[in-house]
UniProtKB/Swiss-Prot annotation:
<keyword id="KW-1043">Host membrane</keyword>
<dbReference type="GO" id="GO:0016020">
    <property type="term" value="C:membrane"/>
</dbReference>
<keyword id="KW-1133">Transmembrane helix</keyword>
<dbReference type="GO" id="GO:0033644">
    <property type="term" value="C:host cell membrane"/>
</dbReference>
<feature type="transmembrane region" description="Helical">
    <location>
        <begin position="210"/>
        <end position="230"/>
    </location>
</feature>
<feature type="transmembrane region" description="Helical">
    <location>
        <begin position="234"/>
        <end position="254"/>
    </location>
</feature>
<feature type="transmembrane region" description="Helical">
    <location>
        <begin position="270"/>
        <end position="290"/>
    </location>
</feature>
<protein>
    <recommendedName>
        <fullName>Putative transmembrane protein ORF807</fullName>
    </recommendedName>
</protein>
<keyword id="KW-0812">Transmembrane</keyword>
<feature type="transmembrane region" description="Helical">
    <location>
        <begin position="657"/>
        <end position="677"/>
    </location>
</feature>
<feature type="transmembrane region" description="Helical">
    <location>
        <begin position="459"/>
        <end position="479"/>
    </location>
</feature>
<keyword id="KW-0472">Membrane</keyword>
Length: 807
């Protein structure tokens, strides 16, 4: 047996090391004896740095800046023999909770790096692609006070995260592991699920957040023999090494989107769906996948966060099987490159997935073909094409030239280094990730959506504004009458939260927004939110509200002809009925017809006798009464909305999810509201024509007649104020997602603050012909807090305040 073969036969090495209740991992580096790799001095330190911490977030706590990290945290390394080095790492595990963010060292993940004759194969996790969250606790201390020493082995065999120092929030997780003879084995408390208990502190009030999503990747280490694993899975044990002990790696992906319970105030009990992604790492020539994965691999691609992602084969001559799994989850992108078997349970024959499929492996045979010519030393220093090969595979970038791969690796290393510098300067990590993605996407055969240089903040504000307008429209249809109390004012924070949600997850692209002219029509400003009285009537023509403009017709029929560069058509009124027939040309050149047939919808008649012309498939709202066409909304909208929120509060637990879905659906239908409004008003100003058929135009509050162009200028001047009052609007939808139990109170307050500045004087709603889809269950970059107190009526209420955003 050659020296090279001896170095490759390392299947007996453990990945996990149990030390004083703390799980640590060893990365086994397989180096050929003739490599130039050095284990001492600066070279060893360089390796630790190359696999070291990645800074992702800056968080201000009590006036102090804390830099939180996620990534491999190198502890120390040791030379085990002439061809193998063990480097010990810690990893910050990730748990994402809507409204509360926890990143704790609850589990350390093993990575196996193997050099088979010079070719790198193994398990590699690109950490910056993992879904990440940040802990909302005072600090991450070190030594005995740190989270490193909070992993305790319980008497029931489970692993819990327990606090060991005052001031650290008492989050702890029960993950369903069983300690058996020194080996941790995944167990199932119930046949088709895993139970996770999340106990949250109550010192600052009832935790109102409903747990919407946990993305948790767990790598569990245990020992088993070749023959035991192969035999239980119906495979031949011939040549398997008989009783050889091998490391086992279990990869489990949890998804709680459809399994949510909220129990007592101090505890959230969540039953988690267990996906059958369970593997055992064995260095043999067999590759085994589970039934569900077999079905996934048959698909050419899948939707990940609304983005088509191909399931591709592993393009290397070292593995000859048709497909090696490229597993992509919403938590990140773990790539499985090595040979694996499904994990051995205590009762493997009786364990099934959530679909009732037994966890029995289906074998596929492959053969390792060693290739000489490289070593892991260069790979770890990020200087050779080996690292570039790995990196390109991690990003799903295939068929790259050697030069492109090396350039890819250089771009990656450079941008990640810049991230650390920018965080120190105060720039957020998200910008760095965008830089990394931008540099890497240039090599992809299927590049991501282009990111043009346009004012993103303004776009996000506009998108959020439309969301609130839509919510009000839906509310108006559903209710009227009663009044709801005001429990909290608005707080300016996280204006881009909603837009970031849409853009980050591919629901909207900046290029599509730019095509419709949205980027050129919005401004970012701030407004006052001092409107607090629940009974105060909205005063017409007050500051910050649009003026009521009345077109008085003295002859029948009365026809308003509009001829401009962007909008053309007519508005005809006869016998008390108005017909609207307009065409709007967008900046992209697309023409949108707007034709509101004659007729009256009585459900939209206010107490002043005005009616609103509005149909679901028509994008313009107007109203007409007694010979007057009024380009406004009704003045009692706020009062009717109070009734809606009062009613909805009683029914919230039953309709919250449905309401959010409706908001998401309607939101995208309406997201081009602002550019079309701007186009309409600009065109009317530019093309102001006199009133035909002898009509005259008067403006309410003025004693003399004026021309149509002057009246339209008044409209446009007040309409121009709309973009200036939208900064707080996106906070509404972001908070609705985070605070389901308090949804109605928050939106009630938000609507009052909004209506103070805009209502009741006009509304123009525009639908786009083909609405996009939005996934509101994706992450939001905002968080919130609740404080419980008694009001003057002796009732317990929760005051809400959106505190900010992370990026």
């Amino acid at each position: 047996m050659s020296a090279q073969q001896q170095c490759d036969l390392t299947s007996y090495d453990a990945m996990y090391y149990l030390q004083t209740g703390d799980l640590q991992l060893a990365v086994n580096l397989f180096i050929s004896p003739n490599s130039s790799f050095s284990y001492s001095g600066n070279s060893g330190q360089s390796i630790l740095q190359s696999l070291g911490t990645i800074i992702i977030w800056v968080y201000k706590v009590n006036g102090q800046i804390h830099i939180y990290t996620i990534g491999w945290q190198p502890i120390y390394y040791s030379l085990q023999n002439g061809c193998r080095a063990n480097i010990y790492f810690r990893l910050w595990a990730l748990i994402q909770i809507q409204g509360a963010w926890l990143a704790s060292e609850i589990m350390n993940m093993p990575v196996t790096l193997k050099n088979t004759g010079g070719q790198f194969v193994g398990t590699f996790i690109p950490l910056h692609l993992l879904g990440f969250a940040i802990a909302d606790f005072p600090s991450l201390s070190s030594g005995s006070q740190g989270y490193t020493h909070m992993l305790m082995s319980q008497t029931d065999g489970s692993i819990k995260l327990l606090p060991s120092a005052p001031g650290v929030l008492p989050y702890f997780i029960t993950v369903g592991f069983q300690c058996r003879a020194g080996a941790y084995v995944l167990k199932q408390p119930c046949p088709n699920c895993i139970f996770v208990r999340l106990c949250v502190p109550t010192s600052n009030g009832i935790p109102y957040e409903v747990l919407m999503l946990i993305c948790l990747l767990i790598y569990a280490g245990c020992y088993a023999s070749y023959s035991d694993i192969l035999g239980k899975n119906g495979l031949s044990t011939v040549g398997a090494g008989v009783n050889a002990k091998v490391p086992v790696t279990a990869i489990v992906y949890f998804d709680t989107q459809q399994y949510i319970q909220q129990n007592v105030v101090s505890q959230l009990n969540v039953t988690i769906q267990l996906y059958a992604l369970i593997w055992v790492g064995i260095s043999t020539t067999n590759f085994v996948i589970l039934p569900e994965i077999s079905q996934i691999l048959k698909m050419p691609s899948g939707l990940i966060l609304n983005i088509p992602v191909p399931f591709q084969a592993y393009p290397t001559p070292t593995v000859a099987i048709p497909r090696i799994l490229t597993l992509i989850t919403c938590c990140g992108t773990p790539y499985i490159y090595n040979q694996y078997f499904p994990c051995s349970f205590d009762k493997a024959s009786t364990v099934t997935t959530e679909c009732g499929v037994p966890l029995v492996a289906y074998p596929t045979i492959s053969q390792m073909q060693p290739i000489a010519g490289s070593n892991v030393a260069f790979l770890l220093s990020n200087q050779s094409a080996d690292f570039a090969d790995l990196l390109s595979l991690n990003y799903g970038l295939l068929n790259l030239t050697t030069q492109q791969k090396v350039s890819l690796a250089n771009q990656y290393s450079y941008t990640m280094t810049q991230c650390k510098k920018e965080v120190i300067r105060g720039t957020y990590y998200e910008e760095c990730v965008k830089n990394v993605s931008s540099n890497l996407n240039q090599y992809s055969s299927q590049p991501a959506s282009p990111q043009p240089n346009i004012p993103v903040d303004e776009i996000l504000i506009g998108v959020g504004a439309v969301a609130l307008i839509v919510i009000g429209t839906v509310a108006l249809v559903l209710t009227g009458g009663a009044s709801a109390p005001v429990s909290a004012g608005l707080d300016v924070a996280g204006a881009e939260a909603l837009g970031s949600l849409l853009l980050d997850n591919g629901a909207l692209s900046l290029s599509s927004l730019q095509e419709e002219g949205l980027a050129n029509t919005l401004m970012q400003t701030s407004v006052s939110d001092s409107f607090e009285s629940e009974d105060e009537e909205i005063v017409q023509n007050e500051p910050n509200s649009a003026k009521l403009v009345v077109f008085t017709n003295t002859n029948q029929p009365f026809t308003l002809t509009v001829t401009g560069t962007d909008i053309t058509g007519t508005v005809t009124i006869q016998s008390g009925i108005a017909d609207f027939d307009l065409t709007i040309t967008l900046p992209s050149g697309v023409s949108v017809p707007i034709s509101v047939p004659a007729g009256v919808i009585d459900d939209f008649t206010d107490d002043q006798g005005y009616t609103i012309y509005e149909q679901e498939d028509q994008p313009v709202r107007l109203k007409y009464s007694d010979g007057q066409v009024i380009y406004n909304t009704i003045s009692q909208l706020g009062k009717k909305l109070d009734g809606f929120f009062s009613l909805l509060k009683k029914l919230l637990k039953y309709i919250a999810v449905a309401l959010l879905s409706a908001i998401a659906s309607i939101l995208v239908n309406m997201f081009l509201f602002m550019p079309l409004v701007a186009s309409i008003m600009t065109s009317i100003i530019q093309s102001g024509q006199g009133v035909s058929s002898g009509g005259t135009v008067t403006v309410t509050g003025q004693s003399t007649s004026t021309t149509l162009s002057t009246a339209l200028s008044d409209i446009a001047s007040t309409f121009g104020q709309i973009p200036q009052i939208l900064e707080e609007i996106p906070v509404a939808l972001a908070s609705a997602y985070l605070i389901t139990d308090l949804l109605t109170d928050f939106f009630g307050d938000l609507w009052r603050g909004f209506s103070k500045n805009l209502l009741p004087n006009k509304a123009v709603n525009v639908n786009i012909p083909q609405p996009l889809e939005v996934d509101l269950k994706s992450r939001l970059k905002a968080y919130s807090e609740a404080v419980i107190s008694k009001n003057d009526k002796g009732e317990w209420v929760i005051n809400k305040k959106l505190r900010g955003r992370f990026s």
